[in-house]
Amino acid sequence: MNVVKYIIFSFALAPLLLVNANTYNFTQIQKRSVNQAVLESSQDTNSVGGEASSTACPLFTTIYTNGITPGTTTIYPTSISTSGVSSNNIDETSVSSESIITSTITTTITSGSQLYTTTITGQNTPVDTVEVVIPTAGTFTTTLTSGSSYPVATTTVRTASGTQSGEVEVITPSCGCSPENSFHLKIDNDKISPSYVYMDPNAPVRTNGAGREGNMFASTNGDNEGLNLFYYDSTIQRVLTCDCQRPSYTVYIEDPIIGNGFSSAWNLIKNSDGIFTPVESRNNEPLHFHVDNNGRVWMTSQEYDTEVSSTDERNFRANDVTLQLY
């Protein structure tokens, strides 16, 4: 069991809700009765906008089971917040773009008119149990944030006759590279050879001139400057770093397909040869990678390329390059 640190909010003289952080990759919610209370639950981790707020590894599931598990750890109360309140007798699901640092799990529980938050900081795959005291009957909401730049997925549960004692198990998968799935990336057809690809975590993702700058780069000197290991998540069709960071590519704001920055507009397809092709999600039309003189990896749509007549006008050092693993 990993060593973890806990912070928990609670009130006395009330039933217990147990939140257990475990490991592995699950995507569905299972429902069972908790001391004869009928629980209704919902979960949504779908994309809601730009790169930073789109669903990525890790996913999780919430399981409701009977009774209290022996050997659980009780964490004592420290403080309380009343923000983000959920009304009684309402089931609802929400997704936001809030995120926290890698290797941190945050579970937020709303009951009646109060909000409680548990933060567990430890290894990439925290495994342990925390015990939460719910002060009022009615509904409670569990919210999980895991890793960096991933959405908050919220599950609201309504009991049939008040809040019942029981266990809520939050299963959080390990996320990232393994010897079997990790690789380096390179750019083929770049004017600099070899051209290695890396994500610069210090590069601001910002709007600059006509473009929205990303943090994915090709080396400018033919060396491995800051070279990353990556892996491919076929569920979200993206290349991610080993700590589950999602690189962003530079785009033109006026690009009618991807200029809005929404990740739902495109997918990254990996073929059997390890070549990654960006495509429009609506019709699988190919998008194009380019590299500018600063090493930024750009992406453009065919619609935008046609409008401006020639990518040569954009002062790229290489047009229509190929992203490939090695």
UniProtKB/Swiss-Prot annotation:
ATP-binding is among the record's keywords: no
Region (2 X 36 AA approximate tandem repeats): 103-175
Keywords: Glycoprotein, Repeat, Signal
Residues spanning the signal sequence: 1-21
Domain DIPSY residue range list: 164-326
Cellular localisation: Cell surface
Glycosylation sites: N25
Location (main, coarse): other
Biological process, per Gene Ontology: flocculation
GO terms under cellular component: external side of cell wall
Sequence-type repeats, residues: 103-137, 138-175
A Pfam family matched in the record: DIPSY
Induction per the UniProt record: Repressed by the srb8 and srb9 transcription factors.
Highest taxon listed in the record's lineage: Eukaryota
Functional note: May be involved in agglutination during conjugation or other aspects of colony formation. Induces flocculation when overexpressed.
Entry similarity comment: Belongs to the mam3/map4 family.
PANTHER family linked to this entry: M CELL-TYPE AGGLUTINATION PROTEIN MAM3-RELATED
Protein name: Putative cell agglutination protein pfl9
Lineage: Eukaryota, Fungi, Dikarya, Ascomycota, Taphrinomycotina
